[in-house]
Amino acid sequence: MKVSIDKFSKVPVYLQIADQIKSQIISGALPRGSALPSERALAQILDVHRNTVVKAYSELKSDAWIESRQGVGYIVAAANDENDAQDERGGEGAQPGRVNWVSEVAEKYLDMEKTFDDLFQRFTDESHYSLGSGVASREVYTSERVAGDIAALLTGSGPCQYFFSPYKGDKFLRQKLVAFLGTKGVKASSGEIQILSETNQALDFIVTLLVKPGDSVVMEEPVHPDMYRVMELAGAKILTVPVDENGMNCEVLESLLTQTRPRLIFVNSSYHDPTGNILSIERRKKIVELSNRYRVPIMEEDAASELVYDGDKLPPIKAFDTTGNVIYIYSFSLTFIPGLSLAFVTGNRDLIRALSYLVSVRLMASDWMTQKLLGMYLDDGIYYTSLLKFRDVYRTNRDLVCQKLDELAPLGVSYTKPRGGVYVWCRLPDGVDSKRFIRRAYNMGVTLIPGHVFYPCKNGGRDHIRINYSYESYERLGQGMDVLRKALEEELEE
């Protein structure tokens, strides 16, 4: 087993050790059942304190990569997940002559943090209360209403080519999005809009156009894991800027810009995921000023700016863009029919032209039904009236979650009440590790997201959890928060 450490890295040493051992397990370099060096032996080899190795092994053990046996020590676990278990029983991985896909697939696509993905996907599991997923409420667009409108689209007049959308996106929808952007103070033509299925796809395509391996990219910290993973897969070096109650710290940002020339500045401007904070109007203007001064593009991601409960709605950064430096990505993931995903990008015409070309190469067709449905709802006003209902549902849910969290204050829980959006960034009592706590909570029936996954270097967030209040009904949300309380009480008793 080969492990090397960089004591000058932002990644904690124990995580460097754990990540390298995990990579070797995934690649097959450390087969199942392989013995690992003792804590003391590995500490001596790496010239680190024994407690550092203890933390690394604990990390791997908690994720079921390794196990400890009395009289034997630490060994690679027999099965890490359902697929590994299938291989142990003689599944396809055990058949002679079969390609070893683990070794064939590029390592960067294998060695990924699974915690966020696993918990996010479990929101459909009705046996658990989902306080982890960022999915729209099911209470606004009823299934009967949607089914009727889809049937009307399918049986309406027009030839069958209406079942396809041009790669740039449905023309009628793009025209309606021009008006939608106008309500946000953003001027754009339909030719400056590219329709895509979701934020992740938009980000992936834009990064493909602009970022080369070795480039630096500035991102907020904490930040949604999907955002920084796209950057990492592109080979970018991530430079992080801390977020406070007013959003991205512009003093730190300016300091970075004076030292390096990043390819992009990524900003989640409104009701930031995971903190729920909103970028102040002063900082929005300052970031545009810095972008112009240092000629660095801004990528602004927005899914929650319409979800305002307290105070005024702020214009996006894009509204202050006079040079075309801002690429604006808007997602309807929190304000439309759950499961029907749609986003769009607006920016400089040359960039959008290049983006459209990339879309035409990678996608044969786009989602016709969702585009037609959203275009119709924007046109007849249903989207805007439904938006008011989303605000009411989410505001009520937010107040319930905050009430439940206030009751946990004597236990040491703290948070800042968000003025909009769908997330509460909750600090756990001293000594409670979020990764360990969310496993206990899950076993008791509630899903949460641990804070460390929002830190690219995994060097923060171990004392935080993200709570989402958009998906569950008011009743189930309250029940889920009660389970969270019981889980926390048990955690503190140990």
Where are these regions (language model features)?
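Conserved core of the PLP fold type I
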Residues: T155-Y294, E306-L307, D312-F320, Y394, ...
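Glycine-centered flexible beta-alpha turn that most often forms the glycine-rich phosphate-binding loop
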Residues: E301
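Conserved core segment of the aminotransferase class I/II
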Residues: T322-D392
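Conserved glycine-rich beta-strand-loop-beta hairpin in the small C-terminal domain of fold type I
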Residues: D392-C402, S414-R427
